[in-house]
Amino acid sequence: MTGAGTPSQGKKNTTTHVKCRRCGEKSYHTKKKVCSSCGFGKSAKRRDYEWSSKTGDN
């Protein structure tokens, strides 16, 4: 029976996110080919949500 303890943490040594070509953040997923910050690879438009800014901010 394998657990999620200390021995399993040693397997987490692969690079998941690299620098994005569009926004420059370290959020581009190398396997999914999508940036979690700006949405590059998924959409031509920038990733933006209503909850990401305060109400009344323009």
Curated annotation (Swiss-Prot):
Its cofactor is Zn(2+). One of its GO terms (biological process) is translation. GO terms for molecular function: rRNA binding; structural constituent of ribosome; zinc ion binding. GO terms for cellular component: cytosolic large ribosomal subunit. Disulfide bonds: none annotated. Zn(2+) binds at residues 20, 23, 35, 38. It comes from the Archaea. A zinc finger (C4-type) spans 20-38. Keywords: Metal-binding, Ribonucleoprotein, Ribosomal protein, RNA-binding, rRNA-binding, Zinc, Zinc-finger. It holds the Pfam family Ribosomal_L37e. Binds 1 zinc ion per subunit. Binds to the 23S rRNA. Belongs to the eukaryotic ribosomal protein eL37 family. This is Large ribosomal subunit protein eL37. The gene is rpl37e.
